């Protein structure tokens, strides 16, 4: 891979930190402001961002301190967790499109209690949204689909920066 085709450590780390932070802020915004309740898989898709954003910030700090190898390793970790996030997004989008079945925890709904006292108790429990129903779509893609695209792009950006950092380190 030519030197001109990969990102520098600071650029890759900033892209991952800023875009990752904006993505997780958007997820929280859809939940808290727009009122879209996340399903169990939606919540799991946030985990790579919770890990990836601090790792990207660490990569930036290591790079600025001249620790290129450490920054490269941190970016490899960012790429790995974002690739896992992309996989979760693809899996979730596939469930929404009916390509495969989701886990039983994602069935949504629930049973209606037959006992009147249990019915009153169940009123405060709330409904778990189904992973198979996209709560929002734009241009045909659900939030899970957009997460798959964003996480893939962040994984590629981090891998590009890691390649540049580690290739320079081994070449020099």
Name each region found by the language model:
Residues 125-172:
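A hydrophobic membrane-anchoring alpha-helix module
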Residues 6-18, 62-86, 156:
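Interfacial segments of alpha-helical transmembrane regions
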Residues 22-31, 83-99, 117:
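C-terminal TM-helix exit segments that contain a strictly Trp-centered aromatic cap at the helix terminus
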Residues 1-8, 168-172:
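Membrane-interfacial, low-structure loops and terminal tails that flank and connect transmembrane helices
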Residues 58-66, 159-166:
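Structural signal for the C-terminal ends of transmembrane alpha-helices
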Residues 97-142:
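Extracytosolic (periplasmic/ER-lumenal) interhelical loops and adjacent juxtamembrane/interface segments
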Residues 56, 75-89, 106-114, 151, ...:
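Hydrophobic alpha-helical segments of small multi-pass membrane proteins
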Residues 36-50:
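Loop-to-helix transition at the N-terminal end of transmembrane alpha-helices
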